[in-house]
């Protein structure tokens, strides 16, 4: 057995006893021991990025030194040991080389439970459905599909179902569609499909994350179709997570869309301010970070609805305060988080605005571009106008043409209608829609930026 690998495991096992489960999983589990650079008086570790290097060094550098100084952990160390954490070097991959398929990930993250899931009006329905599914011996709804924007807690609730099922000694498979594809290709290549089918069709709970990525892969969709049918026929619980509703997953086979809607579908809405503040307080507690009340309120008010971004903001404030040896106050928070508050929705295209509105209201883009008396379509058209006026330089006439409006004076009325609803704050649905559409625009624009930077 690899001695260096054992050393790394011993060190991390000792760290795990000293920090919170979420802190360990999110940060320390990513550390890699570097035996080649380490000496008797200094231990080197690799971390995947500079933020993680700075965070662990500032907040837990002393803890690592203490652990290494007091425990031999398979190394010949001096009494006093220094610790260095560096960014891991990038590994060049030969595109022509044979694919080395990674093992399938079916493990459930034990840090995601129902007990530490923050419940609010935005997600109460999803929470209750998930608990009922996890607690039932036979599927009350099958399948269950939860959908919504990035970072709203969908993966947390999926893992919570898995953890509860494991406590009841059920056989659980939790996998992303990407890993499902990887494992499928590996078994297909090795001609071991019987083993693949046994793995995924002989479980009590089949939990699939990022179900939207099944689309556009005919062989994978075919295999998943048969896996779904067998699980469903044998009354095995199926839970799916997606970033959009089934009918809005473009390119997904109709027969799969139909099956996704056999049971119950529920949307995870963006959190309201009260829920966001509760999330911020919980993340501070789990990460053992103390922030003043006004700083926590500032994060809840000014950082997006993405829970991971809120947690990132908390950590960023703590890291910077440690590095600067400064007290955490509102001024520090405003300075540190300035870049996180920049609105990525600026400069959106009309096409992206249309797509973001369509996904948020479970409509097709083509439906919104045609005038209709249906309330949801009429609201969608008003929202397209509102965001187009906010984020694009398009003149009124071209916007009217985009929405096939003969009277371009209607644009001002549509914009004013939405603006009034938002200012009066009498319609919580429209308020939550605004945040969801902004989040989707940020995602779409970030993808475009990443694509352009890679060209």
From Swiss-Prot:
One of its GO terms (biological process) is regulation of DNA replication. It is found in: Cytoplasm. The keyword Endoplasmic reticulum does not apply. GO terms for molecular function: ATP binding; ATP hydrolysis activity; DNA replication origin binding; lipid binding. Residues 107-321 are annotated as: Domain III, AAA+ region. Residues 75-106 are annotated as: Domain II. Its main location: cytoplasm. Residues 1-75 are annotated as: Domain I, interacts with DnaA modulators. GO terms for cellular component: cytoplasm; plasma membrane. The keyword Cytoplasm applies. InterPro entries: AAA+_ATPase (IPR003593), Chromosome_initiator_DnaA (IPR001957), Chromosome_initiator_DnaA-like (IPR020591), Chromosome_initiator_DnaA_CS (IPR018312), DnaA_C (IPR013159), DnaA_dom (IPR013317), DnaA_N_dom (IPR024633), DnaA_N_sf (IPR038454). Keywords: ATP-binding, Cytoplasm, DNA replication, DNA-binding, Lipid-binding, Nucleotide-binding. Residues 322-455 are annotated as: Domain IV, binds dsDNA. ATP binds at residues 151, 153-155. Gene3D superfamilies: 1.10.1750.10, 1.10.8.60, 3.30.300.180, P-loop containing nucleotide triphosphate hydrolases. It comes from the Bacteria. Oligomerizes as a right-handed, spiral filament on DNA at oriC. Domain I is involved in oligomerization and binding regulators, domain II is flexibile and of varying length in different bacteria, domain III forms the AAA+ region, while domain IV binds dsDNA. Belongs to the DnaA family. NCBIfam families: DnaA (TIGR00362). Plays an essential role in the initiation and regulation of chromosomal replication. ATP-DnaA binds to the origin of replication (oriC) to initiate formation of the DNA replication initiation complex once per cell cycle. Binds the DnaA box (a 9 base pair repeat at the origin) and separates the double-stranded (ds)DNA. Forms a right-handed helical filament on oriC DNA; dsDNA binds to the exterior of the filament while single-stranded (ss)DNA is stabiized in the filament's interior. This is Chromosomal replication initiator protein DnaA. It comes from Helicobacter pylori (strain G27).
């Amino acid at each position: 057995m690899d001695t260096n690998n054992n050393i790394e495991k011993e060190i991390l096992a000792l760290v795990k006893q000293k920090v919170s489960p979420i802190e360990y999983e999110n940060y320390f589990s990513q550390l890699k021991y570097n035996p080649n650079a380490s000496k008797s008086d200094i231990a080197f570790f690799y971390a995947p990025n500079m933020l993680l290097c700075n965070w662990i060094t500032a907040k837990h550098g002393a803890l690592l030194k203490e652990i290494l100084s007091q425990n031999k952990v398979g190394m010949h160390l001096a009494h006093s040991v220094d610790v260095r954490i560096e960014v891991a070097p990038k590994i060049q991959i030969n595109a022509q080389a044979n694919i080395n398929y990674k093992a399938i990930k079916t493990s459930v993250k034990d840090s995601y439970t129902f007990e530490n899931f923050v419940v609010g009006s935005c997600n109460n329905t999803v929470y209750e459905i998930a608990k009922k599914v996890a607690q039932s011996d036979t599927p009350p709804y099958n399948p269950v599909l939860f959908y919504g924007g990035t970072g709203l807690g969908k993966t947390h609730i999926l893992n919570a179902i898995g953890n509860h099922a494991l406590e009841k000694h059920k056989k659980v498979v939790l996998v992303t569609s990407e890993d499902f594809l990887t494992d499928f290709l590996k078994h297909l290549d090795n001609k071991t499909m019987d083993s693949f089918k046994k793995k995924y069709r002989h479980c009590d709970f089949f939990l699939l994350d990022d179900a939207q990525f099944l689309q556009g892969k005919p062989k994978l969709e075919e295999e998943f179709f048969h896996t779904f049918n067998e699980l469903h026929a044998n009354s095995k619980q199926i839970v799916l997570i997606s970033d959009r509703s089934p009918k809005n997953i473009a390119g997904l086979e109709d027969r799969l869309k139909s099956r996704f809607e056999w049971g119950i579908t529920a949307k995870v809405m963006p959190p309201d301010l009260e829920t966001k503040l509760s999330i911020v307080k919980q993340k501070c507690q789990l990460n053992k970070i103390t922030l003043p009340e006004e700083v926590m309120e500032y994060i809840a008010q000014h950082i997006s609805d993405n829970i991971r971004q809120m947690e990132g903001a908390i950590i960023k404030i703590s890291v910077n305060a440690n590095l600067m040896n400064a007290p955490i106050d509102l001024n520090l928070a405003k300075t540190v988080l300035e870049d996180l508050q920049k609105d990525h929705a600026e400069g959106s295209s009309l096409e992206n605005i249309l797509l973001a509105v369509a996904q948020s209201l479970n409509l097709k883009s083509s439906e919104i571009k045609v005038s209709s008396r249906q309330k949801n379509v009429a609201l969608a058209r008003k929202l397209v106008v509102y965001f187009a006026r906010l984020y694009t330089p398009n003149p009124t006439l071209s916007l009217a043409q985009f929405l096939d409006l003969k009277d371009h004076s209607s644009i001002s009325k549509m914009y004013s209608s939405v603006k009034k609803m938002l200012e009066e704050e009498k319609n919580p649905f429209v308020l939550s829609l605004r945040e969801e559409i902004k989040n989707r625009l940020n995602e779409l624009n970030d993808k475009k930026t990443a694509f352009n930077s890679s060209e």
